[in-house]
């Protein structure tokens, strides 16, 4: 194993790292609610990027 660590220690660390990553992700989603207004954000971006199909590209200098 890496750095002379036993399989047991390696798997224990891996499990703890995975659990803390999941707990942190869940905490972010419960506290900040990043997906709550996702639909509104997507609609705003779609409306702000709509282009007139008859528009001509700018002329280069």
From Swiss-Prot:
Location(s) in or outside the cell: Mitochondrion inner membrane; Mitochondrion
Tissue: Expressed in the brain.
GO cellular component term of the entry, any: membrane
Chief place of localization: mitochondrion
Disruption of the gene: reported phenotype: Adult lethal, mainly due to flies becoming stuck in the food medium post eclosion. Rare escaper adult flies have slow motor activity, reduced climbing ability and short scutellar bristles. Larval motor neurons and adult photoreceptors have a reduced ability to maintain a synaptic response upon repeated stimulation. Impaired mitochondrial function in larvae.
Any one GO molecular function term: protein-containing complex binding
Parts of the chain that traverse the membrane: 10-32
GO biological process: mitochondrial respiratory chain complex III assembly
Record's keyword terms, sorted: Membrane, Mitochondrion, Mitochondrion inner membrane, Transmembrane, Transmembrane helix
Sequence ranges on the Mitochondrial intermembrane membrane side: 33-61
Membrane topology designation: Single-pass membrane protein
Mitochondrial matrix-side segments: 1-9
Top-rank lineage group of the source organism: Eukaryota
Pfam entry (one): DUF4516
UniProt miscellaneous comment: Expressed from one of two small open reading frames (smORFs) encoded by a bicistronic transcript. The ORF for sloth1 has a non-canonical Kozak sequence while the ORF for sloth2 has a classical optimal Kozak sequence. Both ORFs are expressed because ribosomes occasionally fail to initiate translation of sloth1 and continue scanning to initiate translation of sloth2, a process known as 'leaky scanning'. The 'sloth' peptides were named for the slow movement phenotype of mutant flies.
The protein's role, per its UniProt record: Required for the assembly and stability of the mitochondrial ubiquinol-cytochrome c reductase complex (complex III (CIII) or cytochrome b-c1 complex), a multisubunit transmembrane complex that is part of the mitochondrial electron transport chain (ETC) which drives oxidative phosphorylation.
Subunit structure: Interacts with sloth1; the interaction stabilizes both components.
Family: Belongs to the UQCC6 family.
Name under which the protein is recorded: Ubiquinol-cytochrome c reductase complex assembly factor 6
Origin species: Drosophila melanogaster
Annotated gene: sloth2
């Amino acid at each position: 194993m890496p750095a002379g660590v036993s399989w047991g220690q390696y798997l224990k660390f891996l499990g703890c790292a995975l659990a803390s990553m999941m707990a942190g992700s869940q905490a972010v989603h419960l506290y900040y609610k990043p997906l709550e207004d996702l639909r509104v954000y997507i609609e705003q971006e779609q409306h702000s990027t709509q282009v007139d199909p008859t528009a001509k590209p700018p002329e280069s200098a």
